Regions:
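Short, Lys/Arg-rich flexible segments
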Residues: 1-151
Length: 151
């Protein structure tokens, strides 16, 4: 369906834009969005986006130095006084000491994704709907007419 093609374009362009802004691989951003496809019965496509923060462990980790105050590099990001630790739930995460927190002085290092994802999807979905949808619908209608006339 035409709507599904336009929605897929919106997902791809939004994911690329967010990946550039946050300096995260496009694949990691794109897998956070799903498309509930439009059907003949329900002609509405629905884009579902996980806007939660992205844990840094997903970027791939390199330790620069083995001192207590060493730098941990994840993708293009650098984190001072960070370390890798296995949590009680069995997952590995990058942790960092947080100044000013008395009770739990370490925290999982995350990249905030909510604001860039919301902004990019709002902009791109509206723009692509305005620009691409009429042309796509026209070409789909032409194709259906071509098929119907051939019979």
């Amino acid at each position: 369906m035409t709507i599904n093609r336009v929605a897929t374009t919106a997902i791809n362009q939004s994911s690329s834009q967010v990946a550039r802004e946050t300096k995260v691989r496009r694949k990691l951003v794109k897998e956070r969005s799903r498309l509930k496809r439009a059907t003949v019965r329900n002609p509405n496509a629905k884009i579902i986006v996980n806007r939660g923060d992205l844990p840094v462990i997903k970027l791939g980790i390199r330790m620069l130095g083995r001192r207590p105050n060493s730098i941990l590099k994840a993708g293009q990001h650098r984190y001072q006084r960070a370390f890798i630790q296995r949590l009680k739930n069995g997952r590995w995460h990058v942790m960092q000491r947080v100044a000013g927190k008395n009770r739990y002085p370490i925290d999982v290092v995350k990249i905030p994704m909510a604001a860039p994802l919301k902004q990019a999807f709002d902009e791109n979905v509206d723009r692509i709907r305005r620009e691409r949808l009429p042309g796509e619908l026209a070409s789909a209608l032409k194709q259906q007419l071509r098929i119907a006339i051939k019979r």
